[in-house]
Amino acid sequence: MALHVMDEANRCLQCKVPQCQKGCPISTNIPLAIKLLKENKLDEAGKMLFENNPLTTVCSLVCNHENQCEGHCVLGRKGAPVHFSTIENYISTTYANKMTEGPKPSNGMRVAIIGSGPAGITIAIILARYGYQVTIFEGKDKIGGVLRYGIPEFRLPKSVLDDIEYRHLELKGIKVRPNTLIGSAITIEDLFRDGYKSIFVGTGVWNPNTLHIKGETFGNVHFCLL
């Protein structure tokens, strides 16, 4: 185990009223994850993190930690907060390598997901846990949406998204149809006629808020999130 990760975990005070958890938008049980890690129960910690947030590995890299979990840590009032982002990344990446379980038994119901951004991926994974037969329709050639095409490589390596596609989608029986736009050649009505009982639309917002400065329209200028 990485020593710096354990050193960071040992700094956690295990507060009775954890402010870090209150600062997390999805209420990740941060004290429990750290406690399990310190007890050498990494698999339990990883399972808990992924069940609460299927994109926990992504969030460990790109979340606004300084204003959320770490920003609410009581240790940060007089010094450095517990850097849970480091701990979460270690747990999630280590446990992800062990995630080889196949799909759940089918409940016979088909669901279409339009868009494979963070919302589409998350709802697809959660539905697959309950036996739904999920198909993701993606307009581009790779999954990820803003995660892949809006966040630069140094913040979120594309290998993380490729691993999610394999372990969380392919192994779970979730089908992905890339380069497929819904709305023109294929309509939502077509999907219902094809037997999909429910449809989730998570196409995202792709138009950037430009700065209106000289040179921003050049071909080698790309918009992204940092």
Q: Where are the model-predicted features located?
A:
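Ferredoxin-type iron-sulfur electron-transfer modules and their immediate structural context
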Residues: M1-R110, K158, V201-L225
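Beta1-alpha1 glycine-rich phosphate/pyrophosphate-binding loop at the start
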Residues: S27-N40, E44, M48-F50, H72, ...
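Phosphate-coordinating loops and pocket residues in cytosolic domains that bind phosphorylated ligands
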Residues: D7, R148, R193
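Short, solvent-exposed polar/charged micro-motifs at secondary-structure junctions
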Residues: T57-V58, V111, A185-D190
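A conserved short coil-to-beta-strand element within the FAD-binding core of flavoproteins
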Residues: R177-D194
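Short hydrophobic core segments
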Residues: I114, G195-G204
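Short, flexible, glycine/charge-rich loop motifs used to bind or transfer phosphoryl groups or to couple energy/partner
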Residues: T100-G102, I164-E165, I188-D190, L211
